[in-house]
Amino acid sequence: MDIEKRLDEIWGADYLNALSPEAKTVLERGYVFYNNEERKDLLITGINPSFREEESKGQLGFNTTKLLEREAKHDVYWSPIRKMLYNQDIDLIDQTAYLDIFYFREKEQTFLKRELLSRPEGIRFIVDQLNLTMHTIEEVIQPKLIIVKNKESAAYFGKEAEKRGWIWMGYALEQVCNTYYGELYKITGLIDSHERIAPEITQTALVGTLVLFTRHINQYTKRELRPTAEFLNRLLHIQSQGIDSYPIEDL
């Protein structure tokens, strides 16, 4: 899958000419993507890459493996993620992929709702990006466990479909239990809805995949609220054995 080629097509689409001047700033900044090229057991997702004023504009592609290496330099975003993936006895780094479900660069979280979701062309811009993300997850990564590391992005997986009618990627989710680190769900299929943003995907490769909806994690998040390598490794083991055969109280 040529992610960069598809992003170039999205960023060059004619309908984006109708965006507001403020919304067009994200087009000028370019996009960020992660080079996910193989299957991984664990996928961590954010919502969109940030943009710091001192950063240069342009298209950027990153190697997730290098960003997650233990020896990588300290970073306010990546260091807390790394600490979730290993301890003295467990190392999940090589089993882990990362992506942001959207590719535009913006620090202000209200920008998405204010400038994009409020306009038809903005919604189309979001849908095109989310379609690419879903294909990447389904066809390339095919994870056994997904950590949705941002409450704002949970709805795009289909978590609010029943309560609010928000379909987006439209995964059919069955709640397993609440854990100290977040809500644990299992993917059982795809929601039967014409509103799914990737109707060409008629069957999901992720049946049985566990999804942990947790909070945004940064350097200020209390240590006891961050999922640990031991906990994530246990979830991967549970997924491989079958969640129905595992005592939920052990979580």
Enumerate the predicted regions with their spans:
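A short acidic (Asp/Glu
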Residues: 54-57, 108-111, 150, 154-162, ...
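Short, solvent-exposed loop/turn segments at secondary-structure junctions
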Residues: 47-52, 102-106, 151-155, 216-220
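Proline-aspartate-enriched helix->loop->beta-strand connector
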Residues: 131-154
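A structural signal for short, well-ordered beta-strand segments and their strand-loop junctions
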Residues: 42-46, 91-100, 145-150
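Active-site and ligand/interface coordination hotspots across diverse enzymes
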Residues: 1-80, 129-132, 197-204, 234-251
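A solvent-exposed, charged loop/short amphipathic helix patch at secondary-structure junctions
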Residues: 55-72, 113-122, 167-174
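Charged, often glycine-rich, active-site loop that binds/positions anionic groups
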Residues: 97, 101-126
